[in-house]
A protein has these predicted regions:
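Membrane-embedded alpha-helical bundles of multi-pass enzymes
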Residues: 1-120
Length: 120
């Protein structure tokens, strides 16, 4: 029985923590137009806010933040975005990485836009 309870508890906790990025994505799509620069900026800002909110308060999970993936590792490798960490901490690195992802999404969307609606 304890294994079943632990499994249910883990599933509920995981679903709760997934609400933060889900809410950020829903708000970004609700407030902005598809393929716009405003959506990329809003999504990056809301994602950063969602991660900050998830890592403070009751939940307090400051690990698995997107910006942590860019910080130096013991082997000496570091992303160019790690240079923003002294200026604004992991949150600025998270925002910079989310902005890069938004720019990439806009580029892919602009490249694929002429092909939309055409039959193969």
């Amino acid at each position: 029985m304890p294994g079943v309870v632990a499994g249910i508890g883990t599933a509920v906790w995981t679903a709760y923590l997934a609400l933060f990025p889900a809410l950020a994505g829903w708000l970004a799509t609700r407030w902005t137009a598809r393929g716009s620069l405003a959506r990329a900026l809003a999504a990056a800002a809301l994602w950063t806010l969602a991660e900050w909110t998830r890592s403070t308060g009751y939940t307090g999970f400051p690990w698995l933040v997107l910006g942590n993936s860019q910080l130096p590792v013991p082997a000496g490798w570091a992303s160019p975005l790690a240079g923003y960490a002294p200026l604004g901490g992991v949150w600025l690195v998270t925002l910079a990485l989310a902005l890069c992802a938004g720019a990439l999404a806009l580029a892919v969307d602009a490249f694929a836009a002429p092909a939309r609606g055409r039959a193969l």
